[in-house]
Structure formats: structure tokens, C-alpha cells
Amino acid sequence: MGDIMLSTVLVANRGEIACRIIRACSEAGLTSIAIYAENDAGSLFTELATVAVPLKGDSIGETYLNQQQILAIAAQYSVDAIHPGFGFLSERADFAQAVIDAGINWIGPSPHAIEMMGDKMTARMTMKAAGVPVIPGEEIESDDELSLIHI
């Protein structure tokens, strides 16, 4: 795998995690693009970023979870990578894949890893197969909660 040269990173998160990512970008000499909802205007992460771009919308779904809007901002600013932080879009395999499909570097686990670890049963089986100690417990999946009472 070759080295990837980055110059601009879009931080697709807010608050303390965004501050940490932006500081790391700054220390590495990278331009950081923060995105923010109206109620986060003036927050520390928007002040620390090289550029802060407002998101349109009133709810989390319309702002920090709006994949199309975030990808459009990434394209507008010609970012080299997107860092999702944790929570929000970091747990969305479809977003990770959309970033990669757009030709932008994804800073995070692969879409496949996100899918595998997002499902607790698959995660347990994957970890056990890899030899990672797992707390003992039943490995039964059921949509019928009443049937699980008798286990």
C-alpha cells in the first residue's frame, strides 16, 4: 500500500472529538474543514478549524447525518479525506462507502468492518474466530423477545 498524501480533511462531527481531530490536523500541517449546525455556530471546534462551513437544516438528521450535504461540501472544498470522529456517521457503512466512491479518503474502519462490528452477533463470532477472548453468553438471535425469556 502506498503512502497517501493529504492536505485537507473534512471533520464530519462536532464538539470535543472534532476539536481533537482538528488539533491533530493542525499539528500535521493539514487544512481542517469543520461543518456545523446553526446551534453550534461559534463553538470551539468551529473556531479551531481552518474553515468552518454551516450546514443547512434544523435537526441532527438534516445536518450532521445528512450524507449528501456533507459530500457536497467535501466536493466544494476539494477535501482529500473525511474523518467521521465517533458516533454520527462513523457507524454508517453506506457513508464510508459513499466517501470512498466519491474518490475521497475515508479515515476510519472499512465499510465491511463497520458492517461486521455493527451487528453484535456478527461481532462476537468474528472476534471469537480471531481468537479474541469474548465474555461468555448465549449466541442466539431472535426477533421474538418472549422466546428468549426461557433461555
Q: Model-derived features: where do they sit?
A:
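N-terminal beta-alpha lobe that positions the nucleotide/phosphoryl donor
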Residues: 2-149
